[in-house]
């Protein structure tokens, strides 16, 4: 279980690093950067779950540690999946709501002023 604990802690550190990196960048209108920034809170939550699983894997008895590690990994993966889905939906909604999204290059029939 020691190896599983170390791997969980390394995954937690990587997730926390990517989450912090996403939060440190300035907000932009780019949908990809927006989706990455929206993923940061779920990455940090997954990092906390993985760190807890890693600590329990190192400190607790074998059977208990195995159960907790499985639950923590499943929770972290589920959190990242739900966060990806939500941030992608948010970025798409924001992109379609922008006023420049209606201008698709057909200037001959356009009645709007160019931005």
Swiss-Prot record:
Transmembrane segments: 1-21, 33-53, 54-74
GO cellular component: a single term: plasma membrane
Family classification: To M.leprae ML0030.
Subcellular location: Cell membrane
Protein name: Uncharacterized protein MT0044
Keywords linked to the UniProt accession: Cell membrane, Membrane, Transmembrane, Transmembrane helix
Membrane-topology annotation of the record: Multi-pass membrane protein
């Amino acid at each position: 279980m020691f190896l599983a604990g170390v791997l969980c802690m390394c995954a937690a550190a990587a997730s926390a690093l990517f989450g912090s990196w996403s939060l440190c960048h300035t907000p932009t209108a780019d949908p990809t950067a927006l989706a990455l920034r929206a993923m940061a809170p779920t990455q940090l939550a997954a990092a906390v779950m993985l760190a807890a699983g890693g600590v329990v894997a190192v400190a607790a008895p074998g059977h208990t540690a195995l159960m907790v590690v499985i639950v923590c990994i499943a929770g972290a993966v589920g959190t990242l999946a739900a966060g990806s889905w939500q941030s992608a939906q948010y970025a798409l909604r924001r992109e379609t709501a922008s006023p420049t999204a209606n201008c698709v290059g057909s200037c001959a029939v356009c009645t709007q002023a160019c931005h």
